[in-house]
Amino acid sequence: KLNNEHCTVIMGAASVVSRTDENVVIACGDVQYEAENLLICTGSNNFVPPIPGVKDNPAIWDSTMALDSKELPQSMIIVGGGVIGMEFATLYHELGVPVTVIEAMPTILPNLDQEVVTILLEKYRKAGMQILTDTKVTEVQGNKVLTTNGEYEAEHILVSVGRRANMQGLEALSDLEMYRGGIVVDEMMRTNLKNVYAAGDVT
């Protein structure tokens, strides 16, 4: 439906070739396209922390793998006590899965009002959820998680430490202002580059 006189859809992997204040050049395959403005909507990817034993470990899940699973794990360790991590922790706990949350910060949900967090933390722990704060993961050995406060084991380990903007193909825009893994925009979705805009999970 997008293919009409106002919009042309081109399937393929695109990359930015060059940018000036007057135009942006994009390459898709062997063809280049030029426009006055660029809107970046490349989304984001799960961030995989450089923790020894995480990469290529079949026990490790990200949020996409957790949602795609057809079976409940026997037990779950969730690395990261942010919003997404605690959403999964609550979900699995309600489904009867023993859950341990490991958060490196002094508290879970660090971006929320701390009075609310205190109430939630008490509720989670009273319900039987194990929540470890101020605890850093140092290594993963199969199903075992080694931390600064001991070792923990579960059938699966869900790594939920945030997402990062998908910047593949945007290397030519090295001057883009970034913050916490996303492109910085104003209320009009403008970046710090005159003719470059961004929207969605990439911000």
What are these regions (language model features)?
Residues V48-P50, E87, Y92, N166-G169:
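Glycine/Thr-rich phosphate-binding loops of Rossmann-like dinucleotide-binding domains
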Residues A14, D134-T138, L170, T191:
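Flavin (primarily FAD) cofactor-binding/catalytic cores of flavoenzymes
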Residues S18-Q32, Q141-E151, I157:
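Conserved beta-strand-loop-beta-strand element in the redox core of flavoprotein oxidoreductases
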Residues A14, Q32-G43, I78-V79, V99, ...:
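Short hydrophobic core segments
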Residues C7-M11, V17-T20, G29-A59:
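Glycine/serine-rich phosphate-binding loop and adjoining beta1-alpha1 elements at the start
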Residues D56-L72, Y152-T203:
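FAD-site-proximal beta/loop scaffold in flavoenzymes
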Residues L67-D68, P73-I77, V83-G142:
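Rossmann-like dinucleotide-binding cores of NAD(P)H-dependent redox enzymes
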Residues K1-Q32, N111-T135:
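N-terminal Rossmann-like dinucleotide/flavin-binding domain of flavoprotein oxidoreductases
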